[in-house]
């Protein structure tokens, strides 16, 4: 008897980020994750891309990385500004760890159409 999934066809669903297999985050959970990025001393980086190119191309920076930024409200306002400027794009935030020179975390805040 074949397995019937109530979730859908997991093999064809594109996942954009660290939390891609979990239910969508609430606004409060997104704020908590951004606060975690800042608390770790990672640099918040905002990127965006049109959904048609999200798996084939590099994502574009929104401004420059926010090196040393400690203000959660500023990061959130820049995420919202990026989404207003590109409403049909995916918008994600990356926590860049300069010590290990790698991404500490990355997740989509807004998903495009």
Curated annotation (Swiss-Prot):
Subcellular location as annotated: Carboxysome
SMART domains: RuBisCO_small
Top-level taxonomic group: Bacteria
Main location: other
Alphabetically ordered keywords of this record: Bacterial microcompartment, Calvin cycle, Carbon dioxide fixation, Carboxysome, Photorespiration, Photosynthesis
GO cellular component, one term: carboxysome
This protein's record includes keyword Magnesium: no
GO biological process: photorespiration; reductive pentose-phosphate cycle
SUPFAM superfamilies tied to this protein: RuBisCO, small subunit
Keyword Kinase applies: no
Molecular function terms, GO-annotated: ribulose-bisphosphate carboxylase activity
Further information: The basic functional RuBisCO is composed of a large chain homodimer in a 'head-to-tail' conformation. In form I RuBisCO this homodimer is arranged in a barrel-like tetramer with the small subunits forming a tetrameric 'cap' on each end of the 'barrel'.
Family: Belongs to the RuBisCO small chain family.
Binding partners and assembly: Heterohexadecamer of 8 large and 8 small subunits. Forms a CsoS2-CsoS1-RuBisCO complex.
Function of the protein: RuBisCO catalyzes two reactions: the carboxylation of D-ribulose 1,5-bisphosphate, the primary event in carbon dioxide fixation, as well as the oxidative fragmentation of the pentose substrate in the photorespiration process. Both reactions occur simultaneously and in competition at the same active site. Although the small subunit is not catalytic it is essential for maximal activity. There are estimated to be 152 RuBisCO holoenzymes per carboxysome.
Protein name: Ribulose bisphosphate carboxylase small subunit
Species lineage: Bacteria, Bacillati, Cyanobacteriota, Cyanophyceae, Synechococcales
